[in-house]
């Protein structure tokens, strides 16, 4: 059990490190702070762990899988931000903190979520995701 927990923590750390570097390279915008708030608000990155496990069966490169996992985490964060909106579930708390729309306003939360979804596609076209890996994934 401890070995699995250590692996989950390593994958979460590696995924967050990639995402932090990727976000840092984004064009300056008022949306960066709410995007980071939704993206780095906790969570175990279980989706990335599942992706790494499946990818390892097909002998995919770990770094490529981290890049794919980062895209998945962006999509997940986007879905949580939008799910919490007043027009959806109207949740004011997410992972023990105010929801993105409560902290930054509804319009900003919508745009931050949309930006995370767009960023996921940008990540999928990342230069370090080798063409041969993309073929294996398809």
Which residue ranges define each predicted feature?
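N-terminal amphipathic/basic leader segments beginning at the initiator methionine
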Residues: 1-23
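Mg2+-dependent prenyl diphosphate-binding active-site environment of isoprenoid biosynthetic enzymes
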Residues: 20-138
């Amino acid at each position: 059990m401890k070995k699995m927990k250590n692996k989950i923590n390593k994958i979460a750390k590696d995924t967050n490190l990639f995402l932090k570097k990727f976000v840092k390279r984004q064009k300056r915008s008022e949306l960066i702070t709410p995007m980071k708030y939704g993206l780095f608000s906790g969570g175990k990155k279980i989706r990335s762990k599942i992706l790494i496990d499946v990818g390892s069966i097909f002998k995919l490169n770990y770094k490529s899988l981290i890049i794919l996992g980062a895209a998945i985490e962006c999509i997940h964060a986007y879905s949580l931000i939008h799910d919490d909106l007043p027009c959806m579930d109207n949740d004011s708390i997410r992972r023990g903190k105010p929801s993105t729309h409560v902290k930054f306003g509804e319009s900003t939360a919508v745009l931050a979520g949309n930006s995370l979804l767009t960023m996921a596609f940008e990540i999928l076209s990342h230069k370090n995701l080798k063409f041969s890996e993309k073929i294996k994934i398809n």
